[in-house]
A protein has these predicted regions:
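Short SAM/SAH-binding signature in class I
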Residues: 225-229
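Mid-domain Rossmann-like dinucleotide-binding core that forms the NAD(H)/NADP(H) cofactor-binding site
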Residues: 131-209
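Short amphipathic alpha-helix with an adjacent loop that forms part of the alpha/beta core around
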Residues: 211-222
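C-terminal hydrophobic helical "lid"/dimerization subdomain
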Residues: 3, 239-243, 284-331
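Short, well-ordered loop/turn sites that connect or cap secondary structure elements
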Residues: 74-75, 153, 245
């Protein structure tokens, strides 16, 4: 099969490699669509730990074309969203509902390739009318669902989201399903601001605008925001967002921050206002339920452009620039 091998830094090479062998409880998936993720960019920039050479790609969908001997042949031909990790169900973390930190997790083979292998439990059948593009967003959507479910909402909650890239938009869609007050999205990119409005934001503001602080003060009100979601992965934006929370406010880190980064914030204020800070990493147990939930979200409009496998460098560069929404690879 053809695969894009990451060789370190921003170097990729298309190679012919053997199709992965499947174990008895596994399935072989023909990869149809792979989403480019900010983590893929961070890996090429040395901001996220990973060791080359390897096949990257973890947001993907496809069709089951072969099954192991312990898997019923009825699964051949099923259209699936693919979870890149599977948990053991037996370790301390799994038994305490922190399956994203499973001590014995098994990773599927990377998806920047024509085929990928995984346990049957990691291949979730998608709705009949769902496109492979939307199905490939199951992975980031499950991270956002797992994170937003950590929050306690009230029927008058005022929510601030900083960043309306894919993670910000997905968080927006999930919180708008709650019985809440309103959602404010802060985003400098005009295309992404427009997308946030189309996807349900009540207010959208430009942090580079002349009246930004004045507008934000009006929207936060006398007592501050109840919930803040940082969807960029920038420690300075995390600190800024926390400063706009009211007493007992809740902050959710959904953006991936660089390793060894620090939060420059007045800990007295954090303590005095009883702020609750949540780190959200991984998909929890939400992955299998996500395809049906996002079916009605209208996520097709988030796909900016699809590239062939040998155009991966262009797709990585455009993702890093942050001017589009979601770029896809079609192996």
């Amino acid at each position: 099969m053809k695969a894009s091998i990451w060789l370190g830094n921003d170097k990729f090479e298309i190679r012919d490699v053997p199709i992965p062998e499947i174990m008895d409880d596994q399935v072989l998936v023909k990869v149809k669509k792979v989403g480019l993720c900010g983590t893929d960019v961070h890996i090429t920039q040395g901001l996220f730990p990973s060791t080359p050479p390897k096949i990257l790609g973890h947001e993907f969908s496809g069709e089951i074309v072969e099954v192991g001997k312990n898997v019923d042949n009825q699964y051949i031909g099923k259209r699936v969203a693919c979870n890149t990790t599977s948990n053991c169900g037996n370790c301390h973390n799994c038994n305490n509902w922190t399956i994203s930190r499973c001590s014995n997790e098994v990773k599927s083979s990377g998806a920047f390739a024509e085929f990928s292998v995984m346990p049957l439990s990691s291949a979730i059948e998608i709705p009949e009318n769902m496109s492979y593009e939307v199905a490939a967003m199951t992975e980031p959507a499950s991270c956002c669902l797992s994170g937003t479910e950590m929050i306690d909402y009230k029927n008058d909650s005022k929510i601030l989201i900083i960043g309306s890239g894919i993670m910000g938009i997905l968080c927006l869609k999930f919180v708008k399903q709650k019985n809440i007050g309103y959602v404010v999205v802060s985003e400098p990119n005009p295309l992404r601001r427009k997308m946030a409005l189309e996807m349900g934001a009540d207010f959208v503001i430009d942090p580079r605008g002349e009246n930004f602080q004045e507008d934000l003060e009006k929207l936060r009100g006398e007592y501050g925001f109840d919930v803040f979601i940082e969807a960029v992965g920038n420690p300075n934006l995390l600190a800024e967002g926390i400063s706009h929370l009211g007493p007992r406010g809740q902050a959710l880190m959904i953006g991936v921050h660089p390793e060894m980064s620090n939060l420059a914030y007045d800990l007295y204020d954090l303590h005095y206002k009883e702020i609750r800070l949540f780190g959200a990493f991984g998909r929890g147990d939400s992955f299998s339920s996500v395809p049906k939930i996002i079916e009605s979200f209208g996520l097709e409009k988030l796909v900016t452009r699809t590239f062939n496998l040998d155009e991966i460098n262009k797709a990585i560069d455009l993702t890093a620039e942050g001017n589009g929404m979601k770029y896809m690879i079609s192996p």
